[in-house]
């Protein structure tokens, strides 16, 4: 009986969420056009916060219903469908099929097959499989059109980069987890050629493919692992220095200038220095981000700084330290060691200017009951294990680390913890220098 009662609750919650979603579509002027076109405008970070929450709520409830109702055969079929869909999107991306189809209108299957030099029959079989999941359409035999979903992979190439990384790197690393575990435990069983231990797959990245791999990894971080703490801005807007005239902000370990561009547009007197992460100096940002090396803004300056070295800018009001992640082709220490080194590198400027603040941004663990967010957090954790032999840092470990950073005159103390209101899975820790005599 308890299961039936819970099912009724989920059905009621789903009805409420769908009603809210329809209201958001109408409120934001999306009442015209096809339903898929209307809903597609609720994708991505640019969607209004209320619309994003309504869509997320509906998806969370659908996930709960699927968990409750699915049996073993359903699970196996779902895995099979997702495997085939991934294979199809990789194939379509490799042969650049989405780019061959006009965003408005249709293309003949025959013309596309001749353009990419593959048999029309094979192209048709792959398109039809992808179409079962809403990626591309075959409105009539022999014709291909974009769906709202597939069109987004053309207008925003970082989605395709993320999918290619998943197919070519993340999925093989995940499937090699058994062999990796056995070898770490001392088994004599030979591992596949793709398995790299100690520092993970990234430590042996193919240098000839490094730029492509780094670009794809940045896209996968954002879209596949929901690692958004390095671009989220909403939890920074409550910082008092941002509203001060001519305030100087330094962003440490940035992977793009996206956050800087957003904040200088929001605060017209803000001056921003972007200190790039090592990998971002080697790869260009995707279209979804902002290539820091190409930024031309009078209030944004781009620098290259070796992580953990003394901070050359001593007079900033805020130092935003981005949470470190492993990068292909870049030597890598553990996140805790890197964060500790960065905090110690910023002791001097905070000691000299007691008004200055460090803001450490990091991924946050979701609240209990948020099935979708918990799933994404587990994806991040296992992906770090499989790709770099790392794991997500717990908040308790970060707080313990903060409490241990100091010098002969004082130490760093946590003064505020800010969570993103936009469901971005991000937290910001506001840290100041406190003299031992001030306690």
From Swiss-Prot:
Gene3D superfamilies: Vaccinia Virus protein VP39, Winged helix-like DNA-binding domain superfamily/Winged helix DNA-binding domain. Residues 79-149 form the HTH iclR-type domain. GO terms for cellular component: nucleus. This is Agnestins biosynthesis cluster transcriptional coactivator AgnL9. It is found in: Nucleus. Keywords: DNA-binding, Nucleus, Transcription, Transcription regulation. Its main location: nucleus. Transcriptional coactivator; part of the gene cluster that mediates the biosynthesis of agnestins, dihydroxy-xanthone metabolites. One of its GO terms (molecular function) is DNA binding. The lineage of its organism: Eukaryota, Fungi, Dikarya, Ascomycota, Pezizomycotina. Residues 109-128 bind DNA.
């Amino acid at each position: 009986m308890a299961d039936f009662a819970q099912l009724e609750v989920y059905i009621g919650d789903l009805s409420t969420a769908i009603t809210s979603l329809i209201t958001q579509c109408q409120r934001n002027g999306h009442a015209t056009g096809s339903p898929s076109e209307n809903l597609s405008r609720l994708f991505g970070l640019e969607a209004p916060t209320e619309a994003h929450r309504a869509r997320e709520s509906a998806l969370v409830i659908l996930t709960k219903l699927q968990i409750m109702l699915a049996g073993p055969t359903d699970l196996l079929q779902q895995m099979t469908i997702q495997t085939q869909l991934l294979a199809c999107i990789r194939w379509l991306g490799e042969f650049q099929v989405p780019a061959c189809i006009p965003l408005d209108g249709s293309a003949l299957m025959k013309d596309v097959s001749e353009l990419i030099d593959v048999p029309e029959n094979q192209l048709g079989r792959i398109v039809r499989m992808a179409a079962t999941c809403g990626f591309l359409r075959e409105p009539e035999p022999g014709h291909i059109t974009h769906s709202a979903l597939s069109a987004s992979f053309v207008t925003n190439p970082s989605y395709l980069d993320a999918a290619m990384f998943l197919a070519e790197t993340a999925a093989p690393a995940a499937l090699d987890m058994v062999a990796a575990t056995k070898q770490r435990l001392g088994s004599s069983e030979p591992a596949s050629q793709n398995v790299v231990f100690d520092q993970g797959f990234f430590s042996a990245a193919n240098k000839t493919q490094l730029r492509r791999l780094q670009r794809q990894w940045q896209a996968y971080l954002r879209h596949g692992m929901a690692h958004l703490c390095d671009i989220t801005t909403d939890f920074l807007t409550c910082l008092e220095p941002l509203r001060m005239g001519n305030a100087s902000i330094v962003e440490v370990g940035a992977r793009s200038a996206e956050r800087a561009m957003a904040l200088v547009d929001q605060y017209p007197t803000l001056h921003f220095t972007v200190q790039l992460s090592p990998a971002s100096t080697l790869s260009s940002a995707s279209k979804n981000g902002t290539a820091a090396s190409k930024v031309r803004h009078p209030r944004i300056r781009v620098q290259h700084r070796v992580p953990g070295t003394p901070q050359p800018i001593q007079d900033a009001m805020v130092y935003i330290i981005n949470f470190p992640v492993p990068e292909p082709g870049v030597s890598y220490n553990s996140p805790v060691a890197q964060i500790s080194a960065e905090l110690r590198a910023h002791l001097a400027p905070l000691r000299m200017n007691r008004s200055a603040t460090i803001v450490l941004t990091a991924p946050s663990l979701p609240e209990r009951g948020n099935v979708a967010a918990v799933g994404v957090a587990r994806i991040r954790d296992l992906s770090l294990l499989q790709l770099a032999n790392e794991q997500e840092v717990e908040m308790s470990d970060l707080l313990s680390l903060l409490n241990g950073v100091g010098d002969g005159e004082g130490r760093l103390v946590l003064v505020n913890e800010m969570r993103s209101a936009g469901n971005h899975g991000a937290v910001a820790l506001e840290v100041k220098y406190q003299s031992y005599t001030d306690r």
